[in-house]
Amino acid sequence: MAKRSKAYLAAAEKVDFDKLYSPLQAAKLAKETSSSKMDATVEVAVRLGVDPRKADQMVRGTVNLPHGTGKTARVIVFAVGEKAAEAEAAGADAVGAEDLIERIQGGWLDFDAAIATPDQMAKVGRIARVLGPRGLMPNPKTGTVTADVTKAVADIKGGKINFRVDKQANLHFVIGKASFDDAKLVENYGAALDEILRAKPSSAKGRYVKKVTVSTTTGPGIPVDPNRTRNLLEDADA
């Protein structure tokens, strides 16, 4: 097990790990326990009661965070002609087709999201093994395979995030920065939680949201009441 820093251990002493905090309490405490001198990212981890090995229990989706992530995502677009021009006008960080594919094959991965027009997907498939494991492969289900590249770029730049359950039935996503107001962090959390609840597979049995923790990148995970899905801005325990 990795040795924890003194700053982390001091921060962890402020957390009662036997308690389930309200989302607002957790947001406040996450900011207080950040051991980073930078504007730390606030993250959420959710354990779901699903079996990701079963195709009908794969949970994935997208959500537009009302207050963004605090970071402007770097977006690339696979497109040609008029659609390429639209993507550039929308603010895409890189636009291309074969040239962009070759660049990625050469090891370039300095971007956070990839969009493709439908006609380019056959070509993009050649780098699926590179993009897929990193969660960067364009997919119609996440709105990243589309002819409306202007909207797709704007959505991602504006705070649209993707979530996908991993092999251990966990979801990880960002809800903002430590500099955000507590209420904005909670409202972002609420928007993501609503979408996760809507994505519940009909075949999932038992408790769906089993565990939730909120933390900054360098801080301890703060346990959140997984049953608290309404009145999230209330400070009191559920």
UniProtKB/Swiss-Prot annotation:
**GO molecular function of the protein, one example?**
structural constituent of ribosome
| UniProt biased composition (Basic and acidic residues) | 227-238
Q: What PROSITE patterns is this protein classified in?
A: RIBOSOMAL_L1
Is Isomerase there in the keyword field? no
Similarity field: Belongs to the universal ribosomal protein uL1 family.
Q: Which HAMAP family match?
A: Ribosomal_uL1_B
Q: How does it assemble?
A: Part of the 50S ribosomal subunit.
List the NCBIfam families: rplA_bact
Can you say what this protein is called?
Answer: Large ribosomal subunit protein uL1
Give the organism the record lists: Rhodococcus opacus (strain B4)
Gene that encodes the chain: rplA
